[in-house]
Design a protein with these regions (language model features):
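Pro/Ala/Gly-rich low-complexity, hydrophilic intrinsically disordered segments
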Residues: 41-75
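Surface-exposed, charged secondary-structure patches
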Residues: 1-22, 66-95, 118-128
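Short beta-strand edge/turn micro-motifs at domain boundaries
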Residues: 18-53, 101, 105-124
């Protein structure tokens, strides 16, 4: 809720290619500069639908939530992040088959609500 961590997500297009991105940004407490700490995305066969308006959400300030600790399955490469005020969390998981998942949760004053849940299928093996 204090603005020191943010997440952006949206569509990208490059020529005939389409996809999406999700990026987690963290403010340097000394310099004030925002730098990315997680960048994720994938290509899509069809572009995401364009929203009528840009959407914004902000965590509720006040009592801090209890943040559950998650563990990955055996073989998962997992990273977990938490904003300093504990109102925004993110989890990045890469499974042994190279499928990926990024989940972002935001404190609404009562619960940590999932606001982004990106799942990417494993890559298709190249045909010989």
């Amino acid at each position: 809720c204090d603005g020191n961590v943010g997440v952006t997500t949206g569509a990208w297009q490059k020529g005939p290619a389409n996809g999406y991105f999700t990026t987690v940004w963290l403010r340097d407490p000394k310099k004030g500069k925002m730098t990315w700490v997680l960048d994720h995305g994938d290509s899509l066969a069809t572009p995401r639908a364009a929203p009528d308006f840009i959407e914004s959400r902000q965590a509720k300030c006040g009592a801090r939530p209890a943040v559950p600790i998650e563990a990955g399955n055996q073989g998962d490469d997992m990273a977990v992040g938490l904003s300093p005020d504990q109102t925004l969390s993110w989890t990045s998981t890469v499974r042994p088959d190279q499928s990926r998942r990024v989940t972002v949760r935001l404190w609404d004053g009562k619960d940590m609500q999932t606001v982004i849940d990106n799942q990417v299928a494993p890559p298709v093996p190249a045909q010989p």
